[in-house]
Structure formats: C-alpha cells, structure tokens
Amino acid sequence: MASSLYSFLLALSIVYIFVAPTHSTSRTALNHRHEAKVTGFQIMLEHVDSGKNLTKFQLLERAIERGSRRLQRLEAMLNGPSGVETSVYAGDGEYLMNLSIGTPAQPFSAIMDTGSDLIWTQCQPCTQCFNQSTPIFNPQGSSSFSTLPCSSQLCQALSSPTCSNNFCQYTYGYGDGSETQGSMGTETLTFGSVSIPNITFGCGENNQGFGQGNGAGLVGMGRGPLSLPSQLDVTKFSYCMTPIGSSTPSNLLLGSLANSVTAGSPNTTLIQSSQIPTFYYITLNGLSVGSTRLPIDPSAFALNSNNGTGGIIIDSGTTLTYFVNNAYQSVRQEFISQINLPVVNGSSSGFDLCFQTPSDPSNLQIPTFVMHFDGGDLELPSENYFISPSNGLICLAMGSSSQGMSIFGNIQQQNMLVVYDTGNSVVSFASAQCGAS
C-alpha cells in the first residue's frame, strides 16, 4: 500500500512547489528574508559510493568504516566538555544531495545529515580546501550572495559565533579533528528546477579532515533553526533509501509532498533533548528476536532529561544500528541461540557477529526481529538486519555503543518510507520499494 502510494506520488510530480504568503510564527521570524514560503518539493539522493566500481564487500566495508567514524563523532558530542569554544557536530554520512548554489547556478553535491543543522559548502578564497568534483563556489561571482550580519538571529543561532567587520563567522568541529571554518552568508539554492532565495549557509574557507570524494559540503537536516527544514519552515519531510549497491537514487520529500504520504502505523514519539536539540530522539520500549521478548528494561533506551544521556536517535548517516551494550549483548546472544549455526569471526569486514551459512540455503532460518515502539511494533525484513558480505557468510548489521546512546542506523531503514513530522512530534515507518517507478 505504502509502496504503491509512494510510487504514485513520485510519478505524479517529480518536483512540486507552491508559494503562499508567509505567516507570523516563531520559526518564520527567523526566515524574515524569505519573500515566499516553499511548501513542497523533491530532492534526489545518491549513495556516496554510487557509480564506483566496487564489489559488495568493498561497499559494505567502506560504509561500515564511515559509520564507525560517525559513531565516534556522535559519542564525542555526548562527551564534549561544556563551555568549549568549538562545538562538535555529527557530519559525514551516506547519502549525497545534488543541488546548485548562486546566480548563475553552480552545481555541487553535499551530504544529507539528520545529525547536524548547518548548511555549508567550500568557498573561495580557500585557506585550506579538499578536492571536489565541481568548481569551488566563488561568492564574488554570484549576484544573489549576501554576507550575514552579526546581528542576524541566524548568526546568533550558531553555538559559538564570532564577528569580523560585522560579518558573521562560524566554526564547526566534527569530533575526530575534522573542522570547517568560514563566513556565514545568504544565497539562492536550487533543487532541480526549484530555486529558493535567501538560504543562510556557511561559506567554508578552511576545511580540514574531509575530502574522501563525499561531496563539497553538508546539508543539515536536524531540528535546529539553521537546518534546511527549519529555514524552509516545513515540519514534515520523508525519505525512502534504496539499499547499498543499488544504482537507483533515493528520494527525499519536503513539506507538502511529505504531507501527502501516509506512512501509518507503526510510529514513534519524537523527543527533543535540551542538551543536543539537533538529534531526532525516538521512543523505543523493547526488542524481540523470534518469539522471544528480550529482558531489556525500557530505561535502557530512555533519554535522561536531566543530563542528556541515554536515549535512541534515528540517523540517516550511521550505517549500522547500535544499541547500548547490555541491550546489544542480549540481542547477540538470542540470535546465536536461535540460529544455531557456527559463529565465525567477521571483524575483517567490520561486523561483530557472523555465521557460516549452510551449503543448502533453504536450511537457513533467520528469526524475526521486532522493535517495539510506543506507537506500534516495527518488524524489520531480514535483509535489513542480516547481510551477506561474501558467500557462505551472513552477519548481523548491528553493534554496541559505548556511551549510553543507541542509534537506529540506515541499513535498517532501507526500502522503508520514513516520515519525520516535527509538528506532531512523531516518526512513522512503512515498507516500500524505494526508487520504484
């Protein structure tokens, strides 16, 4: 049902936009520079390794390595000392967004990141820039570029803004030594045939620790005022991620197009942390393997409102799903008990738990895996939690986090319609053939 509805919507409208008079809300107050309100459009997403001549094993190995690096960044955000000058953000990711910037429009690609807010790309003049496949953006060559004054509310929305000649300056660190520094400005961003003026973004002139062929910047999709959804004043977006190795692009729908998608049950309540308000925390009550409800106290997944520890976030950029250690060990042991196949070392491919598959594949029985959310039970398809990096091997696409926070990763979300509705504080899920025409 959801798959056919999703395909119908994509066939109906590749790109849709409607403009209406802005209305006065606290969010649109931050968007006072916009003359019209964008209510809906689509963006195509490509996997960062799409089109590369890589084997399935190499694709998984690279994705897990990126995911592990991202996990370290996320954990650094939780453990960063208060009052530091440079804030730490998630960065990195698995899906690229193709867009253009400036007038005339100059194409570039950027990571879609639900774990951070800032939109940024590399800019000239560059003190330190990494290689990118498209020319580095030169704001002096764009008739629609403006610098952002220090008095701007979106400048003040930065956690550690600085000021130089009344120009707003930013520094974003990513926990592993990667960092982008530069000036804040406003510019026209173009998605397909849709051009949106006066988007606030970071013009990165000193960018260290990036440059692995993964785009020329980042588009923050988090919950803060600097993110793309917040600047567009949309409270809904959805994506449908195609599997790793697929040549078919994924789709991101914002605003009214996402409003048109009814994902239905199951769903989960969104929670916002006062310590890290960017993240999309969800409400998970328990896990089941096969018919066994695991003896995991719901507090293992609860966000501590006092100090911001714990909880589980849904994230587009982390490859595997990570549970706090006691929950993960319970999942791990139950799969070992129920699958009853030889356990083999999968560390060379980045997995903690792998099994040797029987010579006759029909003898392989994979237990079901269910996530018990407060708004219903999500039973994942087996290919979303067991994957085969090579012949004769299947591996659990999960791991253990060390800092008390769990992460619902993107392998578990593949071929699934995921709808974020911040207006109603809910995330919904529905099975779908992502990328189907």
Curated annotation (Swiss-Prot):
Annotated Peptidase A1 domain residues: 95-430
Signal peptide: 1-24
Disulphide-bridged cysteine pairs: C123-C126, C129-C203, C150-C168, C155-C163, C240-C434, C354-C395
Enzyme Commission no: 3.4.23.12
Glycosylated residues, chain numbering: N53, N98, N131, N198, N267, N307, N345
Keyword vocabulary terms for this entry: Aspartyl protease, Disulfide bond, Glycoprotein, Hydrolase, Protease, Secreted, Signal, Zymogen
Principal place of residence: secreted
Record flagged with keyword Transcription: no
Recorded catalytic activity of this chain's protein: Similar to pepsin, but also cleaves on either side of Asp and at Lys-|-Arg
A GO term for molecular function: aspartic-type endopeptidase activity
Coiled coil location: none
GO biological process assignments: proteolysis
GO cellular component terms given for this protein: extracellular region
Functional pH dependence: Optimum pH is 2.6. Retains 95% and 79% of the original activity after incubation for 30 days at pH 3.0 and pH 10.0 respectively.
Pfam families named among the record's database cross-references: TAXi_C (PF14541), TAXi_N (PF14543)
Propeptide regions on this chain: 25-78
Catalytic site positions: D113, D315
Activity as a function of temperature: Optimum temperature is 55 degrees Celsius. Thermostable up to 50 degrees Celsius. Retains 60% of the original activity after incubation for 30 days at 50 degrees Celsius.
Classification via PROSITE patterns: ASP_PROTEASE, PEPTIDASE_A1
Keyword Secreted attached: yes
Gene3D superfamilies in the cross-refs: Acid Proteases (2.40.70.10)
Regulation of protein activity: Inhibited by pepstatin and by diazoacetyl-D,L-norleucine methyl ester (DAN) in the presence of Cu(2+) ions.
Function: Extracellular proteinase found in the pitcher fluid of carnivorous plants. Digest prey for nitrogen uptake.
Family that this chain belongs to: Belongs to the peptidase A1 family.
Protein name: Aspartic proteinase nepenthesin-1
Originating species: Nepenthes gracilis (Slender pitcher plant)
Gene: nep1
